[in-house]
Amino acid sequence: MKRSEESTSTQSPEEQTGTLHCWRCRKCIASSGCFMTPLETQVVEQDRHESVDAQNTCHLWHMNVDALPEWISCLLQKAQWTVGKLNCPFCGARLGGFNFVSTPKCSCGQLAAVHLCKSRTDHQAAQGGRLMRPALKHLPHPGVPSGCDKETLLTGGGSKTRNHWLLSMARNSNGLGRLTEALCLEVRATYFEMKNEKLLFKASDPKCQPFVPQPDTGRCPSRASHRKSHSLDLNISEKLILLPTLYEIHRKPTAYPRLNETGPIDLSGLALPCSNSSCSFQSPPSFDPNMLLHRLSVAPHETQAQRGRECQCGLEASSVYSDHANANSLPFLMDLPSAGRSVLEASDQEEHLSQLDFLRSASFPLGTINHRLNNRERSKLRTLRRQQRRERWLQKQGKYSGVGLLDHMTVSNEMSTDEETEFPEEKDSYMCAVCLDVYFNPYMCYPCHHIFCEPCLRTLAKDNPASTPCPLCRTIISRVFLQTELNNATKTFFTKEYLKIKQSFQKSSSAKWPLPSCRKGFHLFGGFHRRAAPVTRRQFPHGAHRMDYLHFEDDSRGWWFDMDMVIIYIYSVNWVIGFVVFCFLCYFFFPF
């Protein structure tokens, strides 16, 4: 990876310090005190040996085991000082590794027990005494393509907290100043005090003061941004939307090639070219609140963020395009690093505020202006909608529990919008447990009350129809009963599959096979009648059907004639006693 010549400072290595940053999240992960060789010496040696063969060039940062950062020490203790990988503690990106079992040797001759890859880290040189707090010296305007990295825009000390930044707000007593202050977007929930900080941009015209965040860390690298980095290295976890409707962007061709180093910037005649990568601010000749309301009312329905060209410090300016917006209504987007970057990029939905809500709110989060849902949020919403539809379906099921099966299934089908995708369990209620297909002429087996389709039952009873066991509970099937309502419901809801199974069943030879049933006896003397049991309902294990099975109960009102029972009773004492009683009754009622 090509390193900039500015990495090497003119000061002595003793006075110089440096830091390494993660290539993905741009967070500081180590300092020069944690390495066996000072960072600057390695950078100088690397610049001198760029023409040397790659095998003889060191591509690792060799770390001193006695002065490791805290996060690396924790990883070593967790791995018990054996072998492992070094990942960024902030974003989890791969940075290097360690090996104390068989310590390898680097091409430079040093032991690579604990090392970081140079291709996965970014070096940043800083002044002594400011390892974690380098001053922000080079911050070019996003509209200036080149030549701004060597301009000193702001010189100021670092703040006391790491994640502390200040947002420049327009403070004026006129109408535009108050409206600008009301429309200022807050990234944090609390206001921060301005201590020993200067504004990054000062406008000579009091009516035009653009919003520019001023970071306290100032960790702006003096070289070109990493090829995989996406934004300026600032400790800000949000994005700012700068509304050009407050500044009336004009199309004057006046150019402002360079920025002043120390003095305030006069933006009265500034008109940077507005292209795919940047937009410019310009002082408006006048301000009309009605025009602002009109501009807000015709805001585009959907916008699409387009990443722009990176500047020397990694500050990106993106122009947000729309089908209904012109060049004067393009908002200025500062792409700052945040964990929620996908909220603005990975979604196609957007919510807009009304004009009154937009003007009334003095501070509101970014999501209310340009709120887009990522994949995880959309999945949660879909799950919530499915649960709500399921609850409504269950309520309807309890409400229509007294109607017939066909009507009940019709009501439940109306409550379901997506039959097979949203509620696959409803189709499972119409599937046979043997063939895993929809029911075709379903039969209920007695005494286990399990339901199977006709082709499956005939196939099971092909060899032994008199003692066919149930495929689920292995109970001998004595009788089967056709379920007419279930058959009609299946035919109504799954017509194509039902007809397909019917055609295949009629063409096959299984239609001639018998159904499972035990040997039948005949009633002797008509039997003794008993009182019918009340109507009961049963929940079947493989489906959600509740059916009356009064007529499916054991019809044992008569005496079943069986030769085995006759033989047993002949050789029993009960038969003899019964015969004696019968003779006595005949003698008593029919005397001779």
From Swiss-Prot:
Expressing tissues: brain, kidney, testis and uterus. membrane protein. Nucleus envelope.
Region (Interaction with ZIC2): 282-489
Catalyzed reaction equations: S-ubiquitinyl-[E2 ubiquitin-conjugating enzyme]-L-cysteine + [acceptor protein]-L-lysine = [E2 ubiquitin-conjugating enzyme]-L-cysteine + N(6)-ubiquitinyl-[acceptor protein]-L-lysine
Cytoplasmic side: 1-564
Membrane-spanning residues: 565-585
Domain notes: The RING-type zinc finger domain mediates polyubiquitination of the interacting protein.
Name of the molecule in the record: E3 ubiquitin-protein ligase RNF180
